[in-house]
From Swiss-Prot:
CDD domains: 7tmA_OR2F-like. It is a multi-pass membrane protein. This is Olfactory receptor 2F1. Residues 1-24, 80-100, 161-200, 262-272 are extracellular. Disulfide bonds join C97-C189. One of its GO terms (cellular component) is plasma membrane. The chain crosses the membrane at residues 25-48, 58-79, 101-120, 140-160, 201-222, 237-261, 273-292. PANTHER family: OLFACTORY RECEPTOR. Belongs to the G-protein coupled receptor 1 family. Odorant receptor.
Length: 317
């Protein structure tokens, strides 16, 4: 293959979801509202946990980390997507595309590991409740959170580097909403088997391994719940895990379907829809899931609103 055919591109063109102007404007309004709700919801969860001493527990410490990851992931994708909805020239510089891929891979990896850590926390809370405080002490929680963040940022630069060293042969049109891994790899004009193997290995390490740990944790949790004699006790134990289990199903389900088998990957349209779901819907839904299904969080919201209304009344008088 000639050198001329392997010319590096300086920018990419993201084809996005639609070329129709009216559709793009409608999507801009919809995604802008969803992004604002995502940022506000996750930031309010972090603020609520910070302000309410009753929520200063390992579970909510990890939830704080999850909210930070969610809002960061959405921010790595959505602002650029919104700008391109209204732009005629949907270009993204090479460096910006690489940075977007780096952060999306890193934050995705962090989330998968963090969800496994949260499953372990729920396992200890249900299966070893008497020793919960002794096991899940502050030092261990901090180390588990740091491990989650480090694991994502270790694998991401490797995956990003081997992806963007592929010759693109002047092919700069990315048929996606962002610089997503599989979409960028498809631009290469050389054999990408080694990249697909790397994607598979990375998926096993950062996706399937945490997922298996989650499954093992919940097998033990369910086994313990079934041994509880009282119906009220079983109900309380189940509600302890319900919110996390819902989030696990949302996050792992989409990622496994997209990445675990590159050779039989979904269609381009499905990939775009999965990316929208993962980058916008999931971060927006997570705070709602934890708020609506958790009595402690709902109680903290009521307490905060009561304080806020009291402060407003004082200022008004």
């Amino acid at each position: 293959m000639g050198t001329d055919n392997q010319t590096w591109v300086s920018e990419f063109i993201l084809l996005g979801l639609s070329s129709d102007w009216d559709t793009r404007v409608s999507l801009f309004v919809l995604f802008l509202v969803m992004y604002v709700v995502t940022v506000l919801g996750n930031c309010l969860i972090v603020l609520l946990i910070r302000l309410d001493s009753r929520l200063h527990t390992p579970m909510y410490f990890f939830l704080t980390n999850l909210s930070l990851v969610d809002v960061s992931y959405a921010t790595s994708v959505v602002p650029q997507l919104l700008a391109h909805f209204l732009a005629e020239h949907k270009a993204i510089p090479f460096q910006s595309c690489a940075a977007q891929l780096f952060f999306s891979l890193a934050l995705g990896g962090i989330e998968f590991v963090l969800l496994a850590v949260m499953a372990y926390d729920r396992y200890v809370a249900v299966c070893d409740a008497l020793r919960y405080s002794a096991i899940m002490h502050g030092g261990l929680c901090a180390r588990l959170a740091i491990t989650s963040w480090v694991s994502g940022f270790i694998s991401s630069p490797v995956q990003t580097a081997i992806t963007f060293q592929l010759p693109m042969c002047r092919n700069k049109f990315i048929d996606h909403i962002s610089c997503e891994l599989l979409a960028v790899v498809r631009l290469a004009c050389v054999d990408t088997s080694s990249n697909e193997v790397t994607i598979m290995v990375s998926s096993i390490v950062l996706l399937m391994t945490p997922f298996c740990l989650v499954l093992l944790s919940y097998i033990q949790i369910i086994s313990t719940i079934l041994k509880i004699q009282s119906r009220e006790g079983r109900k309380k134990a189940f509600h302890t895990c319900a919110s996390h289990l819902t989030v696990v199903a949302l996050c792992y389900g989409v990622a496994i379907f997209t990445y675990i088998q590159p050779h039989s990957s979904p269609s381009v349209l499905q990939e775009k829809l999965f990316s929208v779901f993962y980058a916008i819907l999931t971060p927006m839904l997570n705070p709602m899931i934890y708020s609506l299904r958790n009595k402690e969080v709902k109680g903290a919201w009521q307490k905060l609103l009561w304080k806020f209304s009291g402060l407003t009344s004082k200022l008004a008088t």
